[in-house]
């Protein structure tokens, strides 16, 4: 395993192939320990992981905290409603306070895009050793979700040992509200790094044509793309035609607040055109894997029958895989030469 080069993890846009391989190799090791019956290891004993979630979360928050505990780290949980934020303290000052308390890593979720960059910049300016791990920032990025999604697909397609190269030239269909999804953005960076060709499918109000140029989007402090050749992005407005050629499908949650923004005619019409059903899946002659980052809206973006009965619906696999992936990220940040 290479020396880990990142003090902070904000985005997958600056991940190299060796970075991905380090995460997957370590996650696979943790997976094997779990399968052998090992519930806890002392890898991060004496380390303090602080969870700063300013948005509601079930999977990510609990998964990170469980990952930290499985590594024997101490876990400190932040509750916005009972913090000094109610007295006017800024988010950055809150982060500095927890750093001063001795936090080794701050796991942060917030509604503001790029907020983790700002926090990390301030911590570095005061020579703090604390790392920042982005658990979802606005519409920008959700690195651990992107990693666990691609890890789930690699495990599915690998015949024997874990092999990320199995994604090369695979057609991965992403359905839904890409424009408002930090998960989708992280998936685009991760999937394309291994040569997957991505099809984005949905109405133009949720997937604007400019997503074709997604990889040209500037990332703070990044000079060049560490991936020399990425897979392609195409946009489709026909779910049926896209399903016919897909090797895997990632369904995104339809955020119902988009109705208030007049981006959709109705939820029913969206579900009719872009909801994933058994009937639509039958257009593909393979039993392809289905992913969804959760939480799901049953019978809107995906039918209950697909969730409950389709043999390769991997939603629960994603949840399970989130734990070793997040264990790997927490562990690697502590191996950075601070």
Curated annotation (Swiss-Prot):
InterPro entries linked to this entry: Asp/Orn_carbamoyltranf_P-bd, Asp/Orn_carbamoylTrfase, Asp/Orn_carbamoylTrfase_sf, Asp_carbamoyltransf, Asp_carbamoyltransf_Asp/Orn-bd
Pfam families hit by this protein: OTCace, OTCace_N
GO CC field: cytosol
Transmembrane stretches, start-end: none
Residues annotated to bind L-aspartate: 87, 182, 253
EC number(s) recorded for this UniProt protein: 2.1.3.2
Lyase recorded as keyword: no
Residues in coiled coil: none
Keyword terms of this UniProt record: Pyrimidine biosynthesis, Transferase
Molecular functions (GO terms): amino acid binding; aspartate carbamoyltransferase activity
BP-aspect Gene Ontology terms: 'de novo' pyrimidine nucleobase biosynthetic process; 'de novo' UMP biosynthetic process; amino acid metabolic process
Residues annotated to bind carbamoyl phosphate: 59-60, 109, 142, 145, 294-295
Reaction catalysed by this enzyme: carbamoyl phosphate + L-aspartate = N-carbamoyl-L-aspartate + phosphate + H(+)
SUPFAM superfamilies given in the database record: Aspartate/ornithine carbamoyltransferase
Enzyme class, broadest EC rank: transferase
Pathway membership: Pyrimidine metabolism; UMP biosynthesis via de novo pathway; (S)-dihydroorotate from bicarbonate: step 2/3
Family listed: Belongs to the aspartate/ornithine carbamoyltransferase superfamily. ATCase family.
Subunit structure: Heterododecamer (2C3:3R2) of six catalytic PyrB chains organized as two trimers (C3), and six regulatory PyrI chains organized as three dimers (R2).
Protein task: Catalyzes the condensation of carbamoyl phosphate and aspartate to form carbamoyl aspartate and inorganic phosphate, the committed step in the de novo pyrimidine nucleotide biosynthesis pathway.
Name of the molecule in the record: Aspartate carbamoyltransferase catalytic subunit
Organism this protein belongs to: Prochlorococcus marinus (strain MIT 9215)
Gene name per UniProt: pyrB
